[in-house]
């Protein structure tokens, strides 16, 4: 009989692969920024939020906080590095106004240092440490997962799904579903809540995408007029456009 721990590890590995794909999804955007040396209208806010979220989950998964969570540490550690690369690109190609990103990064670093010191010095059991860090992970994870709601409102206003790529919604749904399953096999409420909400939010996106497809109206085709040609004999004395002809072709347009 297959043990629950083995199933959990397999699900976690699949979740790692899907999450890795999600972390890499903005690569083309950043490649365009590098080529054009311009950030244009792109904002660093989502990447700053994801960076903090990854830092919290890495800390949560450490053996000194929540043992047996190596898969949580690995994928969020990878995500931490990827987000740091994205933010470095933002910093290099940003204007002076966007240099405030450095202040936000410093604030996040100080916040994490305060959390780490407070938890390690103030909480002396795994249960208490997991509780404190887990609550923070739920709060910031929920904020990150709820960000697509603003995109959904934009889709409703514009009646266009170009701002909400279907593939990204599907992969996000599978990612949330995978990590929710992982958390339920050996119940972990702190992983279950944000990922369960992620499943709910991305399912709403998929339903909205489907409804938008149904609401698309097919363009109406205007009825095409039909022409009937009638050949009429002309006498030799008749002059048409300065020349004579034996027959005149008259086009009669008929409405369908």
UniProtKB/Swiss-Prot annotation:
<feature type="topological domain" description="Extracellular">
    <location>
        <begin position="1"/>
        <end position="9"/>
    </location>
</feature>
<feature type="topological domain" description="Cytoplasmic">
    <location>
        <begin position="152"/>
        <end position="164"/>
    </location>
</feature>
<dbReference type="GO" id="GO:0008643">
    <property type="term" value="P:carbohydrate transport"/>
</dbReference>
<feature type="domain" description="MtN3/slv 1">
    <location>
        <begin position="10"/>
        <end position="97"/>
    </location>
</feature>
<feature type="transmembrane region" description="Helical; Name=7">
    <location>
        <begin position="187"/>
        <end position="207"/>
    </location>
</feature>
<feature type="topological domain" description="Extracellular">
    <location>
        <begin position="122"/>
        <end position="130"/>
    </location>
</feature>
<feature type="transmembrane region" description="Helical; Name=5">
    <location>
        <begin position="131"/>
        <end position="151"/>
    </location>
</feature>
<keyword id="KW-0762">Sugar transport</keyword>
<feature type="topological domain" description="Cytoplasmic">
    <location>
        <begin position="31"/>
        <end position="45"/>
    </location>
</feature>
<comment type="similarity">
    <text>Belongs to the SWEET sugar transporter family.</text>
</comment>
<feature type="topological domain" description="Cytoplasmic">
    <location>
        <begin position="208"/>
        <end position="256"/>
    </location>
</feature>
<comment type="function">
    <text>Mediates both low-affinity uptake and efflux of sugar across the plasma membrane.</text>
</comment>
<keyword id="KW-0813">Transport</keyword>
<feature type="topological domain" description="Extracellular">
    <location>
        <position position="186"/>
    </location>
</feature>
<keyword id="KW-0677">Repeat</keyword>
<dbReference type="InterPro" id="IPR004316">
    <property type="entry name" value="SWEET_rpt"/>
</dbReference>
<feature type="topological domain" description="Cytoplasmic">
    <location>
        <begin position="91"/>
        <end position="100"/>
    </location>
</feature>
<feature type="transmembrane region" description="Helical; Name=4">
    <location>
        <begin position="101"/>
        <end position="121"/>
    </location>
</feature>
<keyword id="KW-1133">Transmembrane helix</keyword>
<dbReference type="GO" id="GO:0051119">
    <property type="term" value="F:sugar transmembrane transporter activity"/>
</dbReference>
<protein>
    <recommendedName>
        <fullName>Putative bidirectional sugar transporter SWEET7e</fullName>
    </recommendedName>
</protein>
<feature type="transmembrane region" description="Helical; Name=1">
    <location>
        <begin position="10"/>
        <end position="30"/>
    </location>
</feature>
<dbReference type="InterPro" id="IPR047664">
    <property type="entry name" value="SWEET"/>
</dbReference>
<feature type="domain" description="MtN3/slv 2">
    <location>
        <begin position="133"/>
        <end position="212"/>
    </location>
</feature>
<feature type="topological domain" description="Extracellular">
    <location>
        <begin position="67"/>
        <end position="69"/>
    </location>
</feature>
<dbReference type="GO" id="GO:0016020">
    <property type="term" value="C:membrane"/>
</dbReference>
<dbReference type="Pfam" id="PF03083">
    <property type="entry name" value="MtN3_slv"/>
</dbReference>
<feature type="transmembrane region" description="Helical; Name=6">
    <location>
        <begin position="165"/>
        <end position="185"/>
    </location>
</feature>
<comment type="subunit">
    <text>Forms homooligomers and/or heterooligomers.</text>
</comment>
<feature type="transmembrane region" description="Helical; Name=3">
    <location>
        <begin position="70"/>
        <end position="90"/>
    </location>
</feature>
<keyword id="KW-0812">Transmembrane</keyword>
<keyword id="KW-1003">Cell membrane</keyword>
<dbReference type="GO" id="GO:0005886">
    <property type="term" value="C:plasma membrane"/>
</dbReference>
<keyword id="KW-0472">Membrane</keyword>
<feature type="transmembrane region" description="Helical; Name=2">
    <location>
        <begin position="46"/>
        <end position="66"/>
    </location>
</feature>
